[in-house]
């Protein structure tokens, strides 16, 4: 449950960094920073490389209830900054 993480952890759904999803449907970062179709495995790998201690949970984003999966990471600054760092790391890993 998200309330258990308040102040200590950040919940990340793949939709937050997906460039193919508009902001009205859940994207949180600018399209030029976001990445197309991020996979859970990529988010976990990027978070591990950034030292964020990722943990997978079988939960759905409310606007996309049919897609399961979210990642919980340690809070190290703002949520927006963390999302940008993860998106950039995934871009680097895809090269």
Curated annotation (Swiss-Prot):
Instruction: Note the Pfam families from the entry.
Output: SRP19
Where do transmembrane segments lie in this chain?
A: none
The protein's UniProt keywords, in alphabetical order, are:
Cytoplasm, Ribonucleoprotein, RNA-binding, Signal recognition particle
- Name a biological process GO annotation: SRP-dependent cotranslational protein targeting to membrane, signal sequence recognition
Name where it mostly resides: cytoplasm
Which top-rank group of organisms is this from?
Archaea
> Subcellular location, in the record's words?
Cytoplasm
Mind naming one GO cellular-component term on file for this protein?
signal recognition particle
What Gene Ontology molecular-function terms does this entry list?
7S RNA binding
- Subunit structure, per the record? Part of the signal recognition particle protein translocation system, which is composed of SRP and FtsY. Archaeal SRP consists of a 7S RNA molecule of 300 nucleotides and two protein subunits: SRP54 and SRP19.
Similarity comment: Belongs to the SRP19 family.
State its role.
Answer: Involved in targeting and insertion of nascent membrane proteins into the cytoplasmic membrane. Binds directly to 7S RNA and mediates binding of the 54 kDa subunit of the SRP.
What's the name of the protein? Signal recognition particle 19 kDa protein
Q: Which organism is it from?
A: Staphylothermus marinus (strain ATCC 43588 / DSM 3639 / JCM 9404 / F1)
């Amino acid at each position: 449950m998200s309330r258990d993480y308040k102040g200590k952890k950040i919940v990340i759904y793949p939709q937050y960094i997906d460039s193919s999803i508009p902001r009205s449907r859940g994207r949180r970062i600018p399209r030029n920073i976001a990445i197309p179709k991020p996979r859970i495995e990529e988010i976990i790998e990027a978070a591990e490389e950034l030292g964020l201690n990722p943990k997978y949970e079988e939960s759905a984003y409310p606007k996309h209830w049919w897609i399961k999966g979210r990642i919980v990471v340690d809070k190290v600054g703002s949520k927006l900054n963390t999302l940008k760092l993860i998106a950039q790391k995934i871009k680097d890993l895809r090269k």
